Amino acid sequence: MAESETVLVTGGTGFIGSYVAEDLVEAGHDVVAYDLSTDDRILEKLGVADDVEVVRGDITDPTSVFRAVTESGATRIVHLAALLTTLARDNPRSAVEVNVMGTNNVFEAARSLDQVQRVAWASSAAVYAPPANYDGDWVDEEDLVYPDTLYGATKEYNEHQAKVYFEDHDVSHVGLRPTVAYGPYRETGGSAFLANIVEKPALGESFAVEYGDQVIDWQYVRDIAQAFRKAAFAPEEDLSQRIYNVRGEVATIREAAETVARIVPDADIEVSDEGELPWTQMLDMTDAQEDLGYDPEFGLETGFREYIDVLRAEEGLEPLQ
């Protein structure tokens, strides 16, 4: 294991941020969660609220970011704070301020403060063009980047500014391109149906879902957390590049529904093949496996089982064997 270090996690009280904090704590590191929200509900549910220092701050305020990095003594930053797809679309100016200038504040802090050895940060599979551009093939980091959302555009810009900070200012960084994370305590959003396909049957509710024959990357949140830790600590000499695809298990919506039905025998899920999803899901993650040692631990069934048991426990229901 790497020696214990202090890691600042921006967006650290959010869904993915809380799991990243938990993962880092379990790996023996000191964690500071930097976020506009000091609601540690998810950290509490994960059992690490007492082990994580929560610092309230605004990622768009450079003074606030510098102060948090300096006062925490952080040697690594995991930068997750962002406005996601739907919020970005509805609040375009804020999306640019948070996603682009907020990221710039993080890179500026890393450039100015010698203590910071690495910034691991969230890009997104949203930087890729819509799926029709790839002829159903696996997509790797060399393929066409042409986002059709503002969110994706901010992430693409961040890949460019990260490159500049690395080449011109020697700021060590690793950016990851995850798709959509699923797991307990996810906030609802544009991909809420991905949560409902598990959550509703787990609690005995019926659910109807479209897109049955379309492929989704089912990426369990604990695997994404593992990926960010490895991105933060991978030795420089192991990195063949700076931006990596990461994914979980690729399966159709119908296959996911069938998996839920195996776990929850009385699940009432109706699946149709209507509609078309606008995301590129088939990410080749060979480079992340080779360079970062990224190795997803949760397949569809194991991820769904843990997710369902947590949901049922929350509702006072028995776990499913």
State the predicted function of each range.
Residues 13, 163-216, 221-225:
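NAD(P)-dependent short-chain dehydrogenase/reductase
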Residues 7-27:
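N-terminal Rossmann NAD(P)H-binding glycine-rich loop of SDR-like oxidoreductase domains
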Residues 104-150:
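Conserved Rossmann-fold NAD(P)-dependent oxidoreductase catalytic core, especially the SDR/UDP-sugar
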Residues 29-40:
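Conserved glycine-rich Rossmann-like NAD(P)H-binding loop of the short-chain dehydrogenase/reductase
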Residues 146-174:
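Active-site Tyr-X1-5-Lys
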Residues 48-60:
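Rossmann-fold cofactor-recognition segment
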Residues 210-213, 217-321:
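C-terminal substrate-binding subdomain of Rossmann-fold SDR/epimerase-dehydratase oxidoreductases
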Residues 59-98:
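NAD(P)H-binding glycine-rich loop region in Rossmannoid oxidoreductase-like domains
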